[in-house]
């Protein structure tokens, strides 16, 4: 199933509610079809970001959320080449200490115009996603696309629980309806 913000009209794309509703739909689907074990998706890092910031983001994700086992089977057509000095890496990673929110603030400080770590990357990471590859997409304004996956069983309880409660409520209504019909 292909779902993404491209299906949302432009004026609502950067708002949190559509993304929340998309994730809610994803959770509903995974609960209805438990034979599917993984979600796979792409996240884009816009070419509006500097090469330095793009390199920082990729290194940060590879340092903290990379799955080398799965990544060995993926070969990007046009792999993004990280351009960072070791001193820059050490400074940023010492300052952020693998904390997504601290890292997001670093990107905000480095980038002009209030650019932050892309929302979809933050959302995937908060859902326990793993990154496996990065590719430059010349057909999408040379954005860097990250390929990520989530093992359904690794979704946080805070994501699944509200939908499970909704399922439970629906189930109870159906049972009560059937009892009333007897």
What are the functions of these language-model segments?
Residues 1-2, 137, 144-182:
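Non-catalytic substrate-recognition and accessory regions of acyl/acetyltransferase enzymes
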Residues 1-130, 135-144:
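Acyl-donor binding region in acyl/amide transferases
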